[in-house]
């Protein structure tokens, strides 16, 4: 998993809203099929996965609506910025994901996109259930209380 302190991973894009908007039940590291200009654009850090989601269609896993900026030096050989990108996952994992999202209210949300220690682009997706407004308020209240506790412990 890509963490901010781990030197072997370089985080490209992070979906910060995912943990606020969804209950994440489980997560999975998957590969992603990219073109050369997309990889070069990712190396410059020009991407956004905040509005994207993953979907299982025709026995394949797809990343939909992820933004990877056009690479300027690619010229006419560039790529479409919001094209559908195939995600690489084993059949066993795909069956597990298909079963998980078959339940009511479940979806696949991209959490983090990063380069692993071998320089390959990986995507961490989570099986998630949407939060209601009251749940979001509760999460915010817990976070505020934890910050307040830390301040109090630091002071005294």
Swiss-Prot record:
Q: Is Nucleotidyltransferase among this UniProt entry's keywords?
A: no
InterPro entries attached to this UniProt entry: SmpB, SsrA-bd_prot
Q: Does the keyword RNA-binding belong to this entry?
A: yes
Its cellular-component GO annotations read: cytosol
Q: What is its main location?
A: cytoplasm
What are the annotated disulfide bridges? none
| UniProtKB keywords | Cytoplasm, RNA-binding
Instruction: Give compartment(s).
Output: Cytoplasm
Signal peptide bounds: none
Q: Report a single Gene Ontology molecular function.
A: RNA binding
The UniProt entry's GO biological process terms, in alphabetical order, are: trans-translation
Briefly, what is this protein's role? Required for rescue of stalled ribosomes mediated by trans-translation. Binds to transfer-messenger RNA (tmRNA), required for stable association of tmRNA with ribosomes. tmRNA and SmpB together mimic tRNA shape, replacing the anticodon stem-loop with SmpB. tmRNA is encoded by the ssrA gene; the 2 termini fold to resemble tRNA(Ala) and it encodes a 'tag peptide', a short internal open reading frame. During trans-translation Ala-aminoacylated tmRNA acts like a tRNA, entering the A-site of stalled ribosomes, displacing the stalled mRNA.
Q: Which family does it belong to?
A: Belongs to the SmpB family.
The name on file for this protein is: SsrA-binding protein
Instruction: Name the source organism.
Output: Paracoccus denitrificans (strain Pd 1222)
Which gene specifies this protein's sequence?
smpB
């Amino acid at each position: 998993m890509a963490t901010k302190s781990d030197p072997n991973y370089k985080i490209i894009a992070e979906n910060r809203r995912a943990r606020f908007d969804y209950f994440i039940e489980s997560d999975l590291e998957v590969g992603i099929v990219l073109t050369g200009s997309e990889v070069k654009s990712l190396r410059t850090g020009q991407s956004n996965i905040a509005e994207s989601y993953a979907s299982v269609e025709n026995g394949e896993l797809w990343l939909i609506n992820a933004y990877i900026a056009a690479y300027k030096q690619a010229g006419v050989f560039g790529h479409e910025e919001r094209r559908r990108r195939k995600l690489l996952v084993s059949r066993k994992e795909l069956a597990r994901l298909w079963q998980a999202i078959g339940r009511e209210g479940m979806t696949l949300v991209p959490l983090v996109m990063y380069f692993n220690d071998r320089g390959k682009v990986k995507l961490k997706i989570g099986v998630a259930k949407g939060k209601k407004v009251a749940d979001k308020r509760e999460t915010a209240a817990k976070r505020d209380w934890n910050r307040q506790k830390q301040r109090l412990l630091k002071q005294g």
